Design a protein with these regions (language model features):
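Residues lining hydrophobic/aromatic ligand-binding pockets adjacent to catalytic sites
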Residues: 20-146
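Extreme N-terminal basic, low-complexity initiation segments
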Residues: 1-9
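Tryptophan (W) side chains
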Residues: 12-14
Length: 146
């Protein structure tokens, strides 16, 4: 378990790693997830659509999306595989996290992390299942990175 040292600068926090070395981590703004069909809120910050396809029946004006990161969405093959077998949630998360490490997604991940260092971000998704979707997996993956 990491011990926090309460020495802060504007964008960094200090902590002790498991080996007792002093390290610094970039602080992050709040990261939320929300179904794209829900109305925008003032606390949403930057609204980022993380689906590869545009949500059905939703106009761009009503969605009020600030950024559409198709590159960060699961591949079509992975999306279809999960759609055919929703019980394979853990397998989906593992495969999706592997895709996030590949070059097409890496620059989008960097852009997202850079925004998170400056302002709140809400990841938007269209799936009906609010607990098992790519935005949930992406949020978990980003939070594991500190």
């Amino acid at each position: 378990m990491e011990n926090l040292i309460h020495r802060r600068s504007s964008d960094w926090r200090w902590h002790l790693d498991p080996n007792g070395r002093l390290r610094r981590k970039m602080t992050r703004q709040p990261l939320r997830i929300k179904r794209v069909y829900q109305p925008p809120d003032t606390e949403d910050g930057v609204r980022v659509l993380v689906d590869r396809l545009w949500p059905r029946g939703l106009s761009r004006e009503k969605a009020r999306i600030d950024l559409w990161l198709k590159e960060i969405a699961p591949s079509d093959a992975l999306r279809h595989r999960f759609h055919d077998n929703p019980a394979a949630w853990e397998d989906f998360k593992t495969a999706y996290c592997a895709e996030l490490r590949l070059p097409p997604a890496q620059s989008a991940v960097r852009d997202l992390l850079e925004r998170l260092s400056r302002e709140p971000v809400t990841l938007l998704f269209a799936a009906r299942d609010e607990t098992r979707n790519n935005a949930v997996a992406l949020k978990e993956w980003l939070e594991e990175r500190g």
